[in-house]
Structures are given as structure tokens and as C-alpha cells.
């Protein structure tokens, strides 16, 4: 069974609150290396939207509280064996509260529920469902955090198994760090596989998942 590589992003706000996506992130996120892109809204501009659409032929999005257009407020997407629910997150109170989000997750009858709005990356399990927040890929400011770290999530879905890679740009070193979480559909918890001390190994592993993007190509794109 072939793995499905899924990008999860939220709250870009480019150019309103951030000038662009960090070049190191763009060097990894190359068109036609991803099978699916899931956007949680507040993209910011047509150019940013077009960039996201260029990354994969299978794009799904929901509307954020600053978005216009006809995207849905919530959505259910099937990828492999997983039902994935999507919502921006401004619709529930308290904002970002998993207990509040769980009602919508039950309504959608999903295995994985992704939401944004808080600009803070996170993973949690409740009622045998995996809740994911990718944070803000541009590090755009919010009412929750004045200066959040840019972040996004890559999911590798194979059968009933999900590997979650959390990418966060370290503000001090200006290098991205990678954490890895493993989850099996319907389980009560997830497994933290590594911490940021092993980020180099994780970078190599996810690059392999993305069809072995050459390191020289990534470096060249990061310099442009």
C-alpha cells in the first residue's frame, strides 16, 4: 500500500500579517511531491492561494474568519483509510479548545480532525480521534500569540497508520526543527517517536517520503 503524503497548513495571512513563507519551508514544499494539500483558511491573497494549489492536484480548503469566497465552513475528506474533518476553528468557544472542537468531529464522524485559528501547532487525542493544529505556516501574529513560530504539518498516511511530522522554525537559530508522532486509527493515544535532537535524521526521512528531493536543490531554492 502506497503512503499518502498530506500537507496541512493554516493561517498564512500573506501579505497582510507576514511578508512570505520562509524560504526553508518553500525549499521542502515542492510542486508535485505531495499527494494532498489541506488548507484551514485565512490564506491572505490570490498569489498565496495559487502557490498552495501548485503543490498538489488534490487541494481542499475551508473558509477562515478573514476569508471571502465560496469555500465551505467545514469539510470531510477521505484519504486512504482515514476520514479527515476540517474547520478553521473560529466557530467554537473557547477558541482552540479540543473539547469544543470534538462536537464537530463527532458530527463529521472523522478519524482525524484538523483546525487552525490559534496559530499554535499541536497534536492531541480525544475520544479515539486525532486532533491536529498546524499553527501558522508564515508565523503571522494573532490575538493568541504576538510572535508565533512559523509551522506546518506533514502527514504520511499508510493504511490505518499515520505518521505526523511537526515542522517548526526555531526563532533563535532560524532553522526548522522536526518532531515525529505515530498514530493508529481509533487508538486512545499517540506515540512521540523523537525530539528535536534528532532533527537531521527526521529531515532525511521526510525528504525520502517526498521522493528524495536532493539536498542541493533545497539549498539552492532556500538561497533564492
Q: Residue ranges of each PLM-predicted region?
A:
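Charged phosphate-binding loop/patch that engages nucleotide di/tri-phosphates or the phosphate backbone
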Residues: 158-201
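N-terminal active-site segment of His-dependent metallophosphoesterases
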Residues: 1-58, 67-73, 151, 184-191, ...
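Helix-adjacent hinge/juxtasegments
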Residues: 58-110
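Short active-site segment of divalent metal-dependent hydrolases/proteases
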Residues: 14, 45, 91, 120, ...
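Beta-strand-turn-beta hairpins that frame and shape the catalytic cleft
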Residues: 1-7, 76-85, 125-131, 157-163
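Conserved beta-sheet core of the metallophosphoesterase superfamily
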Residues: 95-163
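Short, well-ordered secondary-structure micro-motifs
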Residues: 19, 49-50, 72-74, 96-98, ...
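Active-site neighborhood of phospho(di)ester-bond hydrolases with catalytic His/Asp-centered motifs
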Residues: 7-10, 36-42, 59-64, 86-88, ...
Amino acid at each position: 500500500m502506497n503512503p499518502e503524503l498530506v500537507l496541512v497548513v493554516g493561517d498564512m495571512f500573506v501579505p497582510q500579517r507576514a511578508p512570505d513563507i520562509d524560504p526553508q519551508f518553500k525549499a521542502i514544499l515542492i510542486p508535485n511531491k505531495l499527494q494532498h494539500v489541506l488548507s484551514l483558511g485565512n490564506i491572505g491573497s490570490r498569489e498565496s492561494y495559487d502557490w498552495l494549489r501548485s503543490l498538489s492536484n488534490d487541494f481542499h480548503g475551508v473558509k477562515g474568519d478573514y476569508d471571502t469566497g465560496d469555500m465551505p465552513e467545514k469539510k470531510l475528506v477521505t484519504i486512504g483509510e482515514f476520514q479527515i474533518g476540517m474547520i478553521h476553528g473560529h466557530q467554537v468557544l473557547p477558541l482552540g479548545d479540543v473539547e469544543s472542537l470534538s462536537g464537530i468531529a463527532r458530527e463529521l464522524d472523522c478519524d482525524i480532525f484538523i483546525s487552525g485559528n490559534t496559530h499554535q501547532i499541536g497534536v492531541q487525542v480525544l475520544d479515539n480521534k486525532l486532533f491536529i493544529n498546524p499553527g501558522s505556516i508564515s508565523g503571522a501574529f494573532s490575538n493568541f500569540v504576538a510572535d508565533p513560530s512559523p509551522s506546518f504539518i506533514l502527514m504520511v498516511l499508510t493504511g490505518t497508520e499515520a505518521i505526523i511530522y511537526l515542522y517548526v522554525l526555531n526563532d533563535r537559530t532560524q532553522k526548522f526543527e522536526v518532531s515525529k508522532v505515530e498514530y493508529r486509527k481509533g487508538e486512545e493515544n499517540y506515540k512521540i517517536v523523537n525530539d528535536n535532537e534528532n532533527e537531521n535524521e527526521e529531515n532525511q526521512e521526510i525528504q525520502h517520503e517526498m521522493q528524495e528531493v536532493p539536498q542541493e536543490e533545497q539549498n539552492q531554492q532556500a538561497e533564492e
